Amino acid sequence: MEEEFVSGQKYDEIEISKYGKKSNKAKEEKNKYKQAFISIIISSILILILFIFIHSKIKTNHLTEEFQSKSQSKLNEKDAISDKDKLNEIALKSKLRIYPLAQYFLKRTNYALLNIFNLIKIKKEDIDINRFILALNKTIYNHPVLLSRFYEEDDGEIYIEYRPDLPPEIKIIKIKDEDIPNLKDNLLHIYKPFNSSLVNFTIFLSDDYLYFFYDIFHSNFDGNSVIIFKNNLEAAYLNKTLPKDYFFLNLYNYNQNLKSEKYKSTVNFYKENFDLTRDYCPKFDEDIPENIKNNKSLQLIYKEYSSEELRQQLRKYFGEKPKYYNIFMTMNILLANYIYSDFKDENPTAKIGFNGRNWTIDSNSVGCLIYNYPVIYHFENKVVNIKTFYNKIKELFELKPKLMKYPFEHTERYSSMMSIIQTKGFFSSEFAGKKLELIYFYDNLINMKSNYLMTPLMEELFIDDNITKYSSFFDAKFYKKSSADRFMDIQIKTSKLIMENFDVDKDINLENLF
């Protein structure tokens, strides 16, 4: 405003020189009105400035409160990502203590890692081999955990360190097609986790085919299962953007909060409740024929039931929250195990894999149970209070998100166990032009070599508006078909029992029902 006032003065001087001198009285009269006019203008401006200041202050306070009430994700996306990437760089330079569940898993396997491996077959004419190798390297370097090493300190704690200077070897070997079936036993080996690579990649080239063998340290705490890996490998081959992996940042944040009471209580829960020397697998049939026990291939007995009533009840109690469907499935397994043991196993255990990633009811596969996360419940006197039972399992589940965070930032939906069991669609037709042949996958032989048995019971739940299916897979090595049939019959009854008494606070005598 000051600059405009000066311009006005200059304009007045021009007017005077143009029309000649005026009388002193006229000048004084003019100056009087001029000063009055200027005073009014200045006063108006000051009032306007004051009004704007007060209004902006009120608005700023309102925006501050609104900003504080919003999550960090509502900030400027570019700046937020930049800050997260900077923190991730710091995390990658740190030696970090791994989650209690991962420590449990490593120690329980006697320091031998149970891995899930795959060997796939692709026609050479359907793939650019050099491009495939470049995509493989890009995928590896996109996931820091694949370039990391584990270390055990004197205090017994296990740490992980990012070591890009020690990349995994990618072996390329020429081979004859007829020799592929004989590779299986040679490829299987025990991973000694400390100061050694956590992955094994080999490309076998015959005259007509490329055989790709990939074996990756597999545990639900690191987010790098073979299913995620193959999806990212496919994206890299197609020159698509790969999701950022914030595994180390999540682990860094966990380490930063280790001294807080919240984390202390969670860590102590693991130490107090999970016996590293205990085998949490359910009891097996003792009279399985030796030829089945010693068979090296994975054989499954598949059982399934569908129920419209179950679908309605699940939606009634859990709505659109898939995590609560896992609670139901866990309750069902624990209760069925207790009854299956003729009420002798009062502390049955379910091992929960939490394999569904970012899924919703709409993606159909809302629950998968496998072997990693032991959930224990104590039954006694052949009775159960369903309401108390639910609240306890829910409480145990609430601990899980504090320790295990899915590291990738994307919206794709994964159901790892289904992909593994069905063994279909390992790469899209866009990847290689034609369907690939899966030679073999996941074998119990590696469990035997590492002195560790996968829980031979896998469960899945599918639900949508048209159908609900509850499926179980029993390992034929440890269950006779008659035993699997009995277990499934019990599960059908227990699922109905849980749903019918979900909000009933009373003891139910199980002996009278089973």
Model-derived segments and their meaning:
Residues 64-103, 162, 288, 398, ...:
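Flexible, non-catalytic linker and terminal segments flanking ANL/adenylate-forming cores
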Residues 85, 107-116, 133, 144-146, ...:
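His-Asp-centered acyl/peptidyl-transfer active-site segments
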Residues 88, 125-141, 157-196, 226, ...:
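A short, small/polar-residue-rich loop/turn motif at beta-strand boundaries
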Residues 93, 99, 123-147, 214-231, ...:
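Acyl activation and transfer enzymes in specialized metabolism, enriched
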Residues 100-123, 155-175, 195-200, 209-211, ...:
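Acyl/amide activation-and-transfer machinery of modular secondary-metabolite enzymes
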Residues 143, 147, 224-233, 346-353, ...:
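Extended, hydrophobic beta-loop-alpha segments that form or line the acyl/peptidyl-thioester binding
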Residues 202-249, 483-498:
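Active-site-proximal acidic secondary-structure segment that organizes catalysis
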